[in-house]
Amino acid sequence: MLSFASSLSSDNEAFAIFVNDQFNFKDRKNLLSKEASKKINSYLSTLKDKKSEEEISSFDISGKQKCFIIKVKKKYETYYPEEKGGVFYSYLKNFKVIKKIDIYIDSLDFEKEEIVNFSSEFIFGFSLKSYTFDSARKE
């Protein structure tokens, strides 16, 4: 369901970016098209103006592509990335038609080592939340 993006195309059905508390993000590798960046910045500007407290939000880049915005605190407790991954999984359950999401982890405004640590904990939390006990219940 999740994949880390080394490139983004208009063919993928959904992608997620990470923003800081002020709704800013980095497109370090210029993965986003100019049009997508413009739409994202416009949406982020709206969230900033509304002083949105939402941790996760989404909007349509086009009729076939959705962008998920994940707000991340600069300073956080050690469990925070794991918790954020679980919250993201729960949020995605509202979008049954989406089968695959590209995660643009480099949009985090962190140093490389911190990005690696955050992403591994985020995925761990996502995986934990997605786990079901169906096989244990069957007799």
Locations of regions flagged by a protein language model:
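Short amphipathic alpha-helical segment within the helicase RecA-like ATPase core
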Residues: M1-E139
